[in-house]
C-alpha cells in the first residue's frame, strides 16, 4: 500500500535512538524528508543524514525555545509532527523522594516539549490546509505505576491534550492521534541506567530477570520492537487514513487486559 508520504516534510522529536530513530528511518523509507531533533547526534542518525533525506537539528527539547527552534528549522512547511521525545526515570524510593526539580524535569520533557512543538507547528499546518500530529505516549497513561509516578502523570496529561487538540484542530484539517506503547526494546528499558537496570538494582535482581518478568506480563511474551511502533506512526501520519483523528493506538503485546 502506498501511504502517500513521498515528499512529505516530517518533524520528529527525540530522533537519535530508540523509537524516534525507528520512526525517522521509516519515514525516509517511505520517501519523506525528515527534520530530526535530538540533544546530540548518534552515528545511526548521522548515517541517515548522509543519505540526504534527513536534517539533524541538535537541540534541547526540554527548554522553552527548543521545540520551536526545531520546527522553524523545517522551513515554511511541515506536513507531519511526531512528538516522541521523552524519558522515564524509575523512582524506587517512592513518591516522597520525588523532588520538585524531578517533577519539573519530567514535565518539561514528557509534556511541555510536545505542548511547545504543537504550538509552533499549528500555524504552519493551518496555513497549508492541514497536517498530522502523532504523539508517542505510554501505556502508563492508563496504567499509572508508582515506580514511574511522575512519568505516568505526564503521559496521561499528554494523552488528554492530544484528544482535546483533535477536536479543536480537526476543522482546520489537522489530525491528532496518539500511540501508547508498552515496554519497547530500547535503551529506555534495557540499556544501562534503564528501567530494568534501576529496578533490578533496587530489588536485588538482575536486569535480565526484570526484563523477562516484564515480557511475561504480555500475552505475546515479548517486548515491542521500535519498528513496530514506527509502522503505526506511518499509518496515522498518512492521508490514506484521513478520517482517523482523536484516536489512541495501544501497542503493548496485550499488557492492558481491560476494555
Predicted regions: what is each one?
Residues 9, 16-17:
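Conserved glycine-rich cofactor-binding loop
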Residues 92, 143, 222, 233-234, ...:
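Short C-terminal tail/terminal secondary-structure segment
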Residues 123, 167-168, 242:
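Alpha-helical segment proximal to the catalytic Tyr-Lys
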Residues 138:
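Residue(s) in the substrate-gating loop at a strand-loop-helix junction
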Amino acid at each position: 500500500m502506498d501511504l502517500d508520504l513521498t515528499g512529505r516534510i516530517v518533524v520528529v522529536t527525540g530522533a537519535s535512538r530508540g523509537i524516534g530513530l525507528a520512526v525517522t528511518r521509516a519515514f525516509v523509507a517511505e520517501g519523506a524528508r525528515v527534520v530530526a531533533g535530538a540533544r546530540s547526534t548518534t552515528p545511526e542518525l548521522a548515517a541517515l543524514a548522509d543519505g540526504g533525506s534527513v536534517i539533524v537539528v541538535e537541540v534541547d527539547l526540554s527548554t522553552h525555545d527548543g521545540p520551536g527552534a526545531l520546527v522553524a528549522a523545517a522551513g515554511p512547511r511541515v506536513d507531519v509532527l511526531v512528538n516522541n521525545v521523552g524519558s522515564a526515570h524509575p523512582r524506587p524510593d517512592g513518591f516522597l523522594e520525588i523532588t520538585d526539580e524531578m517533577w519539573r524535569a519530567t514535565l518539561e520533557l514528557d509534556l511541555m516539549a510536545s505542548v511547545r512543538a504543537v504550538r509552533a507547528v499549528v500555524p504552519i499546518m493551518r496555513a497549508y490546509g492541514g497536517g498530522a500530529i502523532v504523539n508517542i505516549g505510554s501505556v502508563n497513561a492508563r496504567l499509572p505505576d508508582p515506580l514511574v509516578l511522575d512519568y505516568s502523570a505526564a503521559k496521561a496529561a499528554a494523552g488528554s491534550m492530544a484528544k482535546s487538540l483533535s477536536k479543536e484542530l480537526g476543522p482546520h484539517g489537522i489530525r491528532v492521534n496518539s500511540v501508547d506503547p508498552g515496554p519497547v526494546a530500547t535503551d529506555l528499558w534495557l540499556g544501562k541506567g534503564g528501567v530494568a537496570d534501576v529496578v533490578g538494582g533496587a530489588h536485588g535482581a538482575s536486569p535480565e530477570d526484570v526484563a523477562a518478568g516484564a515480557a511475561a506480563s504480555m500475552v505475546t511474551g515479548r517486548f515491542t520492537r521500535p519498528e513496530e511502533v514506527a509502522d503505526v506512526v506511518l499509518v496515522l501520519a498518512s492521508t490514506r487514513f484521513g478520517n482517523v483523528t482523536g484516536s489512541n493506538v495501544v501497542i503493548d503485546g496485550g499488557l492492558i487486559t481491560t476494555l
